[in-house]
């Protein structure tokens, strides 16, 4: 019982330590709301959505690679080659 309690306390301590010592990314969203500013977290998400539409702020590559019928494809969750027309069952089926 004591060992279980010690493990739980250690896990909580390490989790808190991870969040406290985390370094902010250089690519963070500008003008994000926060606890101290008026608007709070409700202001964060609409601004984040608008900034992600801006190609200069967002460095994500949203281009989809389409495979033709009969070509190899990957399940969308795992890879980046999709069947844009039809279904993927290791190969594109129209």
Curated annotation (Swiss-Prot):
The presence of a 'disulfide through disulfide knot' structurally defines this protein as a knottin. Expressed by the venom duct. It comes from the Eukaryota. Keywords: Cleavage on pair of basic residues, Disulfide bond, Knottin, Neurotoxin, Secreted, Signal, Toxin. Disulfide bonds join 66-84, 73-88, 83-92. Residues 1-22 form the signal peptide. Transmembrane segments: none annotated. This is Conotoxin Qc6.1. It comes from Conus quercinus.
């Amino acid at each position: 019982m004591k060992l279980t309690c010690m493990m739980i306390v250690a896990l909580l301590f390490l989790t808190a330590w991870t969040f406290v010592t985390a370094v902010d990314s250089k690519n963070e969203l500008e003008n994000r709301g926060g606890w101290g500013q008026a608007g709070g977290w409700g202001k964060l998400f609409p601004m984040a959505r608008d900034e992600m539409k801006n190609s200069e702020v967002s460095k994500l590559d949203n281009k989809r690679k389409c495979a033709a019928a009969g070509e190899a494809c990957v399940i969308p969750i795992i890879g980046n080659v999709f069947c844009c027309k039809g279904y993927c069952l290791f190969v594109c089926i129209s």
